[in-house]
Amino acid sequence: MSWYRPLLPAAVLIPLLAACSAPASDPVGGKAAPGFPYTVSNCGVTTTYQAPPKRAVTMNQHVTEVMLALGLQKSLVGTAYLDDAVLPAYKKAYDAVPVLAKEYPSKEALLAANPDFVYGGYASAFDAKAGRSRDDLKRSGIASRLNTEYCPSGATGLDDVYREVDEVGRTFGVPDRAAAWTREARAGVTATEKRLKGTAPVSVFVYDSGDKTAFTAGGKGIGNELITRAGGRNVFADLDKTFGDATWEQVVARKPDVIVIYDYGSTTVEQKKRRLLDDPALREVPAVKNRRFAVLPLSDAVLGVRAPGAVGKLADQLHPAAR
């Protein structure tokens, strides 16, 4: 049986003090909240928080779920951009947060929420052309954080998930919640690895999207580590990107045993399967020939709180005999 049990948000939140930005305001009464001031470097931006932010906006689902996993819904004044359904454990909390836009909000809509902190999941959340760059926000007195999967660095993995949760927990004054979540997440991954002991890895091609080319998971993103820990071998691990394009000729040459389909957006899993099955050029690819498909929601395969549980979910599909 695979492990997945999202940490339920705490019922009682630590009281939030004055808003933090750059420059940060002073805490109430001049006394620092426990754990503050807190200085963190994130994707090249260093910020000192004098107190937990109290008017946060999240853009992109996986960072929204980080906040909800830590019981921080009362710190949210807005959210935007879902890829798929919010986890059931977080739905009630999510429904209480104003949705600023179906995708990214305009600069005007974002500023109208009067945030003191903006948390983006992808670099596109901080689009300079749309007036939402981190520098733009800083000039407006708003602190920001970018999910570390999109920082210019090396390959990311589950340790980066734990660090992301820890840093967000510290930023909002709830480090104990972050530590509790991480302990549970690590235990689940360990349990999956134990039951896979002795199984031979299967070769995996991730099909995210694409027609003329295949948009796939490369070796730098967390999706690559999820495959490895779930008992697979990413056939495009040599692609030096989180996501990137591969030719269909490369897919054929690398002969994947299983195709993992990322589920999101308006194109359904069945439509993606049909595109692969109907392509005569892919007919002899083992995964296509044997109709071996696995499915993960996109939100499972990015750097967020779903990633540790996704190891077990994917392992069940790659190695059903080891369930």
What feature does the model see in each segment?
Residues 50-53, 60, 64, 107, ...:
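Extracytoplasmic/secreted envelope proteins and their assembly/folding machinery
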